[in-house]
């Protein structure tokens, strides 16, 4: 699995996106062309439509003039799923179904990701998206002893292995997850973690 996150250098707003490439073989970079675009707004579609493969699809709730569009009826789903904050998870459900990811595996991932309070809303939203379309691909499930780890977590683990016992930082992208990981392991690893008042 190779992920690439792109975000603008501003406190809030701007166009942000994540590109995910996965394979049963090792991958070392992303590719220019993509199989699927989940467009949460029209701007995303306009900026990335030229990167879509000929047999690719766009999943969006926006009114887009695109033959390959799979439309998410979020206005209807909103009436069933009372929490508007989880509507993005509808798109996640549609992606999982499109790639043929088993529902049971998806449920386990959602349980690991969300706390008990938000899990029920997110699983309801996920099911709405999952039931919207048919699978185009059928991924083979393989056991893999390798772990999935991001760069910041690898950096934090490396620092701990090298003997780091103090970490001081401010929760600001792109280093927020380093601070979060150190904080979550501080008691277990005997590390002093300090979050400073501001980024200066």
Question: PLM ranges: what are they?
Answer:
Residues 143-200:
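Non-catalytic terminal/interface segments that mediate subunit docking, oligomerization
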């Amino acid at each position: 699995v190779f992920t690439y996150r792109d975000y603008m250098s501003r406190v809030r707003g701007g166009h942000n996106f994540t590109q995910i490439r996965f394979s049963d073989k090792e991958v070392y970079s992303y590719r220019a062309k993509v199989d699927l675009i989940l467009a949460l707004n029209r701007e995303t579609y306009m900026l990335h439509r030229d990167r879509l493969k000929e047999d690719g699809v766009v999943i969006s709730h926006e009114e887009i003039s695109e033959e390959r569009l799979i439309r998410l009826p979020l206005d209807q789903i909103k009436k069933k799923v009372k929490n508007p904050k989880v509507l993005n998870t509808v798109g996640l459900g549609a992606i999982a179904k499109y790639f043929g990811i088993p529902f049971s595996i998806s449920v386990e991932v959602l349980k690991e990701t969300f706390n008990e309070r938000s899990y029920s809303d997110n699983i309801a939203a996920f099911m709405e998206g999952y039931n919207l379309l048919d699978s185009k691909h059928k991924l083979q499930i393989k056991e893999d002893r390798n772990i999935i780890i991001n760069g910041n977590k690898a950096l934090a683990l490396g620092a701990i292995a090298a003997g780091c016992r103090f970490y001081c930082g401010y929760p600001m992208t792109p280093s927020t997850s380093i601070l979060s990981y150190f904080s979550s392991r501080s008691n277990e690893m005997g590390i002093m973690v300090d979050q400073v008042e501001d980024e200066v």
